[in-house]
Design a protein with these regions (language model features):
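Acidic/His/Gly-enriched intrinsically disordered linker/tail segments
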Residues: 390-463, 471, 492
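Amphipathic alpha-helical substructures
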Residues: 287, 408, 454-516
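N-terminal, polar/Ser/Thr-rich
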Residues: 28-101
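Zn2+-dependent metallopeptidase catalytic core
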Residues: 104, 109-111, 118, 156, ...
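Hydrophobic alpha-helical segments
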Residues: 1-21
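Juxtacatalytic substrate-recognition/specificity segment
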Residues: 148, 218, 271-381, 385, ...
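A surface-exposed beta-strand-loop module
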Residues: 115, 125-185, 241-248
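Extended, low-hydrophobicity, Ser/Thr/Pro/Gly-biased non-transmembrane segments
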Residues: 59-63, 168-264
């Protein structure tokens, strides 16, 4: 993408140079005079053509269907009377070139007595080769059609009862073009690595698991400075050390896909909330994390939130991995593991007084999002709404700080600051005169709107929750209400916690929580 823009801007600049006014002539005359020297227009056209070619063939982005409501790969019927009994992969990332190579093996039991076709999702940047069944080469094809960052690999398999399918794969993993403007998920470097599903090894699409699921063994070879963290309950162990300064890690899992993180991580083991927590963060953040009291913040949050709201649904009950990653958007969670956005733990974010009175309290705020935002999700489609994960997160942070430092500290650094910000909000010229806001240029309007929305979500909503606490009978009553909301039965079609859910649980109306 950088090459695309560099060539485009250089081409445009060259064209503008050709149009510099000469001999009192206008733009067309000056251009006609400049192009007499053939190399000038050739350079301009070459740069523009190079930009167009780079845009069309950029190696980092795939050609996934832009209509993300289409899920054709999930409509592929399962092979009849065929199960996968196990699978494995040996993965060799090149952290210098940013590429991946590997060998994958799949073992099937076919009781149909019929030949059949196995389907896999593969990263569009990978090339498939050396596909063999029980040692013999077999035909295969990779679709031109792509969706959700996958192309479909189809392999013709015989009617044999026991089948071992092996294949080699490798290349530069491409990003989904539908999210290419966001921070990349797939990354391969000596500092950080993330391989998800088809980026790790071809993902099996149309074969059901055997009686033991999809027993999986993954081996990955990386520089010795990197630690491997499977996303989930699996534990990775070093099984070999090579003379070239690399280590081979191995772990077992049970799924058709899988996600793996690796990097120059520091691990801290913390006991909190009845769980053993493995807290992983990048070595480059060590000074910031230690200054913010990260380990103490994790313990405080997990102890408090587990006692008041309940266990996280994505923990195993005994262990939980908290992994700092470069994922954007707040992270995600699965059985036994959860992500923390790297951007939440920068020095700039940890000094944001809107989230807490100091770096340690901002750390608490970000960790509380494991309960409000990840453990319970919020619909963020209405940007004008003051109801979001931030309201309950800021309120919970206030309660934890109040418990740790006392009511006076919490009142001064939280409630009083919320009230001051809300008072200023309703005195704001653009709040009192929204027509003037709409008349501003878009860039200025968005900047002001974002600032105003911040006040409503981070200050006004916590004040409303605090008022609700007083109306329902105090902190213990509010804790019971929030615990019930956190552990409620979710609607799979709309799993979000809404403002109306909160009001109903409190037995209140919107008018009851007006601050005026």
């Amino acid at each position: 993408m950088r090459l695309t823009w560099l060539a485009a801007l250089a081409g445009i600049w060259t064209v503008s140079y050709l149009c510099i006014r000469q001999y009192g002539k206008g733009l067309p005359g000056s251009l006609a005079r400049s192009v007499r020297r053939a190399h000038r227009p050739i350079i301009a056209l070459s740069l523009l053509a190079c930009s167009g070619f780079a845009y069309a063939a950029q190696p980092l982005v795939d050609r996934s269907n832009p209509d993300q409501t289409v899920m054709d790969f999930y409509q592929v019927p399962y092979a009849e009377n065929v199960v996968c009994t196990s699978r494995s992969a040996q993965v060799f990332p090149d952290t210098t070139a940013g590429t991946v190579s590997g060998t994958a093996a799949y073992r099937f039991r076919n009781t149909s007595g019929q030949a059949w076709t196995a389907a896999f999702g593969v990263n569009p940047g990978y090339t498939i080769s050396n596909v063999r069944v029980n040692g013999a080469e077999v035909p295969f094809s990779v679709s031109d059609y792509q969706e959700y960052n996958e192309a479909m690999l189809e392999v013709a398999l015989p009617s044999d009862r026991e089948i071992e399918l092996t294949m080699d794969y490798g290349g530069f993993p491409r990003e989904n073009r539908n999210v290419s403007i966001m921070q990349g998920g797939t990354e391969i470097s000596s500092e950080y690595l993330c391989l998800e599903n088809a980026g790790l090894s071809p993902r099996l699409i149309n074969v059901l698991p055997g009686e033991n699921g999809y027993p999986t063994t993954i081996e990955i070879t990386l520089p010795a400075s990197m630690s491997v963290i499977p996303f989930g309950a699996s534990k990775a162990e070093v099984v070999a050390e090579q003379t070239d300064g690399t280590k081979t890690w191995r772990y077992d899992s049970n799924s058709a896909g899988g996600i793996l993180y690796a990097g120059d991580y520091i691990r801290q083991d913390i006991q909190a909330g009845g769980m053993d927590i493995e807290f992983y963060y990048g070595r480059k953040h060590q000074a910031v994390m230690e200054a913010a009291g990260a380990a103490e913040a994790v313990k405080s949050v997990v102890d408090y939130c587990t006692a008041h709201y309940g266990m996280l649904s994505f923990g195993t009950g005994d262990t939980l991995k908290l992994i700092q990653s470069r994922v954007t958007g707040g992270g995600y969670a699965a059985n036994g593991a959860s992500l923390l956005d790297e951007a939440d733990f920068t020095a700039d974010n940890l000094s944001d007084t809107g989230k807490g009175g100091g770096a340690g309290e901002v750390m608490i705020h970000e960790l509380v999002h494991q309960w409000w935002g990840l453990g319970n999700m919020f619909d963020a489609s209405d940007e004008s709404s003051l109801w979001s994960a931030e309201g309950l997160t800021v309120y919970t942070t206030y309660r934890i700080v109040k418990e740790r430092y006392g009511p006076s500290y919490a009142q001064e650094h939280y409630v009083d600051q919320w009230q001051q910000a809300v008072d200023n909000y309703y005195l704001n010229f653009y709040v009192r005169n929204p027509d003037y806001l709409e008349a501003l240029p878009e860039e200025e309007r968005l900047e002001i709107s974002n600032s105003l929305r911040y006040v409503r979500q981070y200050c006004e909503m916590p004040l409303k929750i605090l008022k609700a606490e007083q109306l329902v009978g105090g902190e213990e009553a509010m804790d019971r209400i929030l615990r019930g909301l956190f552990n409620r039965e979710l609607d799979p079609m709309y799993p979000y916690l809404t403002y109306q859910d909160f009001l109903n649980a409190c037995g209140l109306t919107e008018e009851d929580l007006n601050l005026a």
